[in-house]
C-alpha cells in the first residue's frame, strides 16, 4: 500500500512539474536551445521502451523505473510522427513476469515484444545527493540508450547507441525556485531532465535553461 501511495505522490509531483514547465521543458532559465535529433527511424513504426537498472538502484528508488518508462514513452509518442508504442504498464508487467529478461539477447527481446524498434535504456549511475553527503541534494542519472532494429541482419548489433549523463541542478545553475526543494522533487526534476535528453535523440526539439 505504501509503495502505491509513493507512486501516486510521484505521479502528482511529476504532473505539477510538467504543468509549471509548459509540459516539454522543465526549467525556466537563461534561454532556449535548439537540439537536433540523431535517430529518426522511429517514425511510423511500433516501439517499446524498456528500462533496466541495478537491483540496488531499484531497491532504493522503487518508483524510478516506472516513472522513466512512462515519461520516455510519453515524449516519443508526443513528438515522433506515426509512432505507436507498447504501453508502459504492459512493459512493466512483462518485466515482472520475465525476471531474467535482461540476460536474453536483444534479438530475442524484440521478437517477444513484437515491435519494430526496441529502445533499451540501461541506467548506470542514479542518485539524488552528493556521494557521502545526503544533505547536499543533486540528482544524477547516467545511462546508455540503445536502439534494436527488428529487420536488421543481426538485431543483436544495435542500430544506434547514445550515452546520456544529466545532473540537476548543474554546478552554477540558477538556484531560483530551489529553496526548500525535497529529495523527492530533486529526483523528479532529474528524471524529467534525463528523459528530455534521452528521448530527445529521436526528434528535433528545444530546451529551456
Where are these regions (language model features)?
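Bacterial N-terminal signal peptides that target proteins for export
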Residues: 1-12
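Bacterial Sec-type N-terminal signal peptides, specifically the leucine/valine-rich hydrophobic h-region
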Residues: 17-20
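C-terminal/domain-edge helix-coil "capping" segments
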Residues: 23-45, 109-112, 137-140, 146-209
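N-terminal segment of the mature soluble domain
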Residues: 46, 51, 55-124, 150-153, ...
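Short, glycine/charged-enriched secondary-structure capping and boundary segments
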Residues: 63-64, 134-137
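Extracytoplasmic/secreted cell-surface and envelope-processing proteins
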Residues: 128-133
Amino acid at each position: 500500500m505504501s509503495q502505491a501511495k509513493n507512486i501516486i505522490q510521484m505521479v502528482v509531483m511529476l504532473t505539477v512539474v510538467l504543468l509549471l514547465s509548459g509540459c516539454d521543458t522543465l526549467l525556466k532559465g537563461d534561454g532556449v536551445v535548439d537540439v537536433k535529433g540523431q535517430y529518426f527511424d522511429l517514425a511510423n513504426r511500433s516501439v517499446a521502451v524498456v528500462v533496466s537498472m541495478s537491483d540496488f538502484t531499484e531497491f532504493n528508488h522503487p518508483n524510478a523505473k516506472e516513472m522513466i518508462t512512462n515519461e520516455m514513452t510519453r515524449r516519443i509518442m508526443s513528438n515522433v510522427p506515426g509512432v505507436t508504442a507498447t504501453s508502459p504498464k504492459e512493459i512493466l508487467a512483462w518485466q515482472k513476469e520475465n525476471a531474467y529478461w535482461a540476460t536474453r539477447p536483444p534479438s530475442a527481446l524484440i521478437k517477444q515484444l513484437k515491435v519494430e524498434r526496441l529502445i533499451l535504456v540501461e541506467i548506470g549511475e542514479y542518485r539524488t545527493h552528493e556521494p557521502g553527503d545526503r544533505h547536499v541534494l543533486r540528482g544524477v542519472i547516467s545511462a546508455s540508450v540503445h536502439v534494436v532494429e527488428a529487420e536488421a541482419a543481426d538485431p543483436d548489433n544495435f542500430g544506434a547507441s547514445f550515452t546520456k549523463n544529466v545532473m540537476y541542478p548543474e554546478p552554477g545553475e540558477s538556484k531560483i525556485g530551489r529553496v526548500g526543494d525535497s529529495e523527492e522533487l530533486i529526483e523528479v526534476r532529474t528524471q524529467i531532465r534525463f528523459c528530455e535528453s534521452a528521448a530527445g535523440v529521436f526528434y528535433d526539439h528545444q530546451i529551456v535553461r
